Regions:
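Preference for long, amphipathic alpha-helical scaffolds in soluble/luminal domains
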Residues: 1-287
Length: 287
C-alpha cells in the first residue's frame, strides 16, 4: 500500500486493518472537500473535475460512514449543506453527471450526454438521501428532503425489471443504513434481492474478462440471503481474488479509459489502493 496508494487510501488501510487513526482519514478526506461542502478534486479517480459533484460526494459519504463520522463534525455539516444546495428540484434527485465532467480528463463512462441521467437514475441519489437522513435531525429540512428522495426511489425500485449492479449497491447501502425505516422493508429487501440475483455474473470463467458484478460485488456478509443461496460461488470468488493478485501484491482495475491511456495510467495507480481496501474487506468478512 505504501508504494501503490494515495495518502487517503493508506490512512484508510491503517485505520481499517492496522489500528490507525480515524482523524488521519478525515484529515486527508477533507483535502478533497470544496468550500461549498461538496467533494471533487479527483476523489473518484475516474474523473478529475475539481468542482463538487454528486458522485465524489457519495464516495466521501461512504468513507465518512466507515470511520463512524457523526452529524456534529464540521466535515459532515458542510457536506449536508452541499446536498441541500445541489439537489436538482426539476429532476428530483442529485444529477449524477453534469456537462462540466467533460471539461476534464475522465473515463468514458463518466461522459456527459443529453438524457444521460436516464442511464444512472438513482445512482447515487438513493444512497445520498439515506446519508442525508442519517446525518440530520428529524423534522429538519435535510431529513425531509432525504425521505422525499427515498420515496421516489422506492417507487422506481419496485417498477424496475433489472438494474446495474452499482445502482443495486446504492439501494443495498441505503437499506442497510435506514433498516426498517425504509417503507415496507421486507418488500424492499425482496426486490433488491431479486435484482441482485439477476445482475450477478454466475459464470466464474468469465470473471474479469468484462466489466460486471461478481458474487462478492453484491453479497456483502454471511447474513445475506444470497450468501446461503450462492455460497459455493462466493467461495469460488474468494479463490478468484487470491488468483488475481499481481506479483506486487495488489489488484488491477478491470476497466480502462479507452484511447486515453496516458491519463488512465494515473487513475489506475490511484484505483489500485482503493481496490486493495475493497478486496481486503471482502476477504476478512468471508474467510
Amino acid at each position: 500500500m505504501q508504494r501503490n496508494a494515495r495518502p487517503l487510501e493508506l490512512a484508510r488501510w491503517e485505520y481499517l486493518f492496522d489500528g490507525g487513526s480515524r482523524e488521519r482519514v478525515i484529515q486527508y478526506l477533507a483535502s478533497y472537500q470544496n468550500e461549498d461542502g461538496g467533494f471533487g478534486n479527483g476523489l473518484e479517480p475516474d474523473f478529475w473535475l475539481p468542482d463538487s459533484s454528486a458522485i465524489a460526494t457519495w464516495s466521501a459519504c461512504q468513507q465518512l460512514i466507515e470511520v463512524n463520522a457523526t452529524k456534529d463534525e464540521k466535515i459532515v455539516r458542510n457536506l449536508v449543506n452541499y446536498l441541500l444546495l445541489s439537489y436538482n428540484r426539476e429532476a428530483e434527485l442529485w444529477l449524477t453527471v453534469t456537462p462540466e465532467h467533460n471539461l476534464y480528463p475522465h473515463a468514458p463512462h463518466w461522459q456527459y450526454t443529453k438524457d444521460v441521467q436516464s442511464k444512472w437514475m438513482y445512482n447515487p441519489s438513493v444512497e445520498l438521501a439515506a446519508y442525508l437522513i442519517h446525518w440530520s435531525n428529524e423534522e429538519s429540512e435535510a431529513n425531509k428532503l432525504g425521505w422525499q428522495v427515498i420515496e421516489k426511489a422506492l417507487t422506481y425500485l419496485q417498477q424496475a425489471e433489472d438494474m446495474g449492479f452499482h445502482e443495486i449497491n446504492n439501494y443495498q447501502k441505503a437499506a442497510n443504513l435506514l433498516q426498517d425505516k425504509m417503507g415496507d422493508s421486507k418488500k424492499v429487501l425482496a426486490k433488491i434481492h431479486q435484482l441482485a440475483e439477476r445482475a450477478m455474473n454466475k459464470l466464474p470463467d468469465t470473471w474479469g474478462k468484462s466489466y460486471g458484478a461478481t458474487p462478492l460485488d453484491l453479497i456483502h456478509n454471511k447474513e445475506d440471503l444470497l450468501y446461503h443461496q450462492y455460497r459455493n460461488l462466493v467461495e469460488e470468488n474468494i479463490v478468484y481474488l487470491h488468483k488475481t493478485i499481481t506479483t506486487e501484491g495488489v489488484w488491477n482495475p478491470s476497466w480502462d479509459w479507452g484511447d486515453d491511456q496516458l491519463n488512465f495510467a494515473v487513475a489506475k495507480q490511484q484505483w489500485i489502493g482503493i481496490i486493495a481496501i475493497n478486496n481486503q474487506q471482502k476477504l476478512q468478512i468471508f474467510q
